[in-house]
Amino acid sequence: MKRIPCIAIACLILTLSGCAVKSAADAETVCDPGSGPEPPQFCLTAELPAELQRSAEDSAEGRSVYTRAAGAYEVVIETAAGAPDAVLRQLTGRETAALDPVYLAWPQADQYQFAWTGADDEGALACCGTLLYDGTTCYTLPLRCAAELEKTYLGEFARILAHTRLTDAA
């Protein structure tokens, strides 16, 4: 008599095994790869000295230029699409290997700090800057001054670069 219920249960188990509920991990999904969530939007923020005046802005290009009185130095805040190597090359005219930037990994973005020398119509320039890369966009803040004024403003440049970060645009 005990054999009949056991056989009935065994048959029931064998016939109902195909009726299992799929877990979320096993479920098939169909999605449009282009319809994922939008990447986060960031803004580059920096604590600039009150003496700096905005001398130019091109919001279509994502570029703002600040100068200290009498043109002692210039700060440019700019966004650019592309890989950090290409943006650094465009910004400085040098390859990344020649710049040997200091790389810092942050949760929101990778940061590259760099320095270089250059020249313009008025003479030799001392330049330094930072680039933050969120995976799609480069946010740059280079500082340029006459080479003979570099020691005068070195502490101010260090403070500006130390307080440069990405913040949510929302």
What are these regions (language model features)?
Residues 39-43, 70-74, 120-124, 136:
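Glycine-centered tight beta-turn/hairpin loop motif at sheet-sheet or coil-to-beta transitions
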